[in-house]
Swiss-Prot record:
Keywords: Amino-acid biosynthesis, Cytoplasm, Histidine biosynthesis, Hydrolase, Magnesium, Metal-binding, Zinc. The keyword Metal-binding applies. It comes from Streptococcus sanguinis (strain SK36). One of its GO terms (biological process) is L-histidine biosynthetic process. InterPro entries: PRA-CH, PRib_AMP_CycHydrolase_dom, PRib_AMP_CycHydrolase_sf. It catalyses: 1-(5-phospho-beta-D-ribosyl)-5'-AMP + H2O = 1-(5-phospho-beta-D-ribosyl)-5-[(5-phospho-beta-D-ribosylamino)methylideneamino]imidazole-4-carboxamide. Its EC number is 3.5.4.19. Pfam families: PRA-CH. This is Phosphoribosyl-AMP cyclohydrolase. Gene3D superfamilies: Phosphoribosyl-AMP cyclohydrolase. Binds 1 Mg(2+) ion per subunit. Binds 1 zinc ion per subunit.
Amino acid sequence: MTEVKLDFQKQGGLIPAIILDHTSKEVLMLAYLNEEAYQLTRTSGQMWYWSRSRQELWHKGATSGHYQTVKKITADCDLDTLLIEVDQLGAACHTGAKSCFFHPIWDEKDGKTD
C-alpha cells in the first residue's frame, strides 16, 4: 500500500469519501472519515466512518448486515477527499435503497428542474 499524508485538518478533522460500487461504478453514498475511521478501514478491509450526527465511529454493516468490503482507495489531488470502491452487501442507504442518490432533480434530456 502506498502511504500518503491525507489532509484531515482542512475540513475540521474529517475527510469526505465518495463510495462507489466496485463492479458497476454506481455512486452509493457520501460519508466522512476521521483519522481513526481511515486507519480502521485500511487495517480491516471494511468501511468505517465517522457519524457526524452521533459523533461516533460507525462500522458500516455492523447493525444492518450491509457490509462494505474495500477494493480500492484513491485520494484526490489535494489529498482531502477519497474515492473508495467497495463490494456492497445489501443496501448502502439507511432507507434500504441500493444507493443514497435516488431523488432526481434535473435531467438534461427533459431540461426540467424540480
